[in-house]
Curated annotation (Swiss-Prot):
Has antibacterial activity against E.coli ATCC 25992 (MIC=49 uM), E.coli CIB 84492 (MIC=25 uM), S.aureus ATCC 25923 (MIC=6 uM) and S.aureus CIB 85462 (MIC=3 uM). One of its GO terms (biological process) is defense response to fungus. It comes from Odorrana jingdongensis. Belongs to the frog skin active peptide (FSAP) family. Brevinin subfamily. Expressed by the skin glands. Pfam families: Antimicrobial_1. This is Brevinin-1JDc. The keyword Disulfide bond applies. GO terms for cellular component: extracellular region. Disulfide bonds join 18-24. Its main location: secreted. It is found in: Secreted. It comes from the Eukaryota.
Length: 24
């Protein structure tokens, strides 16, 4: 993967987990 993709994933994954767990 490109570094840019990893950067995006690093931001998206915690956000998705936050929304699913509803512990924002």
């Amino acid at each position: 993967f490109l570094p840019a993709v990893l950067r995006v994933a690093a931001k998206v994954v915690p956000t998705v987990f936050c929304l699913i767990s509803k512990k924002c």
